[in-house]
Amino acid sequence: MTSILLALAILGYLSIIFESPIRINKTITSILTGSLCWIVYALLYDGDKHEVAEKLIQHFGEISGLLIFLLGAMTIVELIDIHKGFSVITNRIRTKSVLKLLWIVGGITFFMSALLDNLATAIIMITLLRKLMPKSETRMILAGIVVIAANAGGAFSPIGDITTTLLWIGGQVSAYGIVKVLFLPSLMCILVPLIIASYRMKGFTMLRVQLSMAEVIKEEKMRGSLSVFLAGVFGLVMVPVIKSITGLPPFIGVLMALAFVSLVSIIYHRNKPQEVKEKYSVAYALSKVDVSSILYFMGILLLVYVLQEVQILSQLSVFLQQSF
């Protein structure tokens, strides 16, 4: 049984890696692999089949907590984006210097990814860069810095990256421990590329027509943008605090934060027509959430837990410790 499950896991991961050539979405592959492995495990299990069902239900409870957490956090980010909340920061970027823009964009991305999540932050900042300047070597370098900064910033936060979130929710690490141990290494991971890029970009100049991000990105000033942005950031920051004080799973804090942000939005749009209110509602924000990513992680976690049940992961851990 162990050999069959290991073979299925390897085949599944290879299919995910070669998603583009085989033209099969990685979400479908992960769900199929995770589900199939549990079916094989149940069919070949020597004991009572009800024990397998109980184990699956127990593990899926943990998985559900993570999925609800991700769904809530991603919905908060979408609500902020719908209200043009991120323009509160980006519209204050005013510089004609490429070097200054490099450091400003890198710094904003680094800290924003720690408060939100690295993927959403990278998408937001790269979208802004595309509006700020035409395709060029300068934009490519800045986009590269955005990706590095987003990953570095998300690494030292319990809610900034899916990996740290998994470890935090699973109880392997604490929120304070992640920040304490990983902040300086994460900071170095962005400072070194910024310094290297600064030397490479000496002599680069901005196009004359592009004086500031605020002038290029003429965001409509929306009533409540600042309030929704601050409510979202405050709510997400409070998630680790609520967990440490109450001991409750993080998804409780995220759900409370989502309700808080939604309430702020409702207050600002309460006197508008119903069709306008719907454009700023939680339901509309949910429709913009990347649900396929959530399902992808569900499949991966199902696979991980079944491998854990047959001791493959523990044996691999012992092997790596003895080898290295």
What residues fall within each predicted segment?
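Interfacial loop-to-helix junctions that mark the boundaries of transmembrane helices
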Residues: 1, 21-27, 51-64, 175-184, ...
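Structural signature of hydrophobic alpha-helical transmembrane segments
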Residues: 1-8, 61-72, 113-122, 151, ...
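Hydrophobic mid-bilayer segments of alpha-helices in multi-pass membrane transport proteins
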Residues: 3-13, 23-46, 63-75, 225-235, ...
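Juxtamembrane and boundary regions of transmembrane helices in multi-pass small-molecule transporters
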Residues: 4-6, 136, 140, 156-157, ...
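C-terminal ends of transmembrane helices
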Residues: 13-23, 75-91, 130-133, 196-200, ...
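Membrane-embedded alpha-helical segments and adjacent helix-loop junctions characteristic
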Residues: 50-138, 292-324
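Transmembrane helical segments that form the transport core of multi-pass membrane transport proteins
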Residues: 83, 92, 105, 235, ...
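Alpha-helical transmembrane segments and, especially, the helix-loop junctions at the ends
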Residues: 113-123, 140-171, 193-194, 198
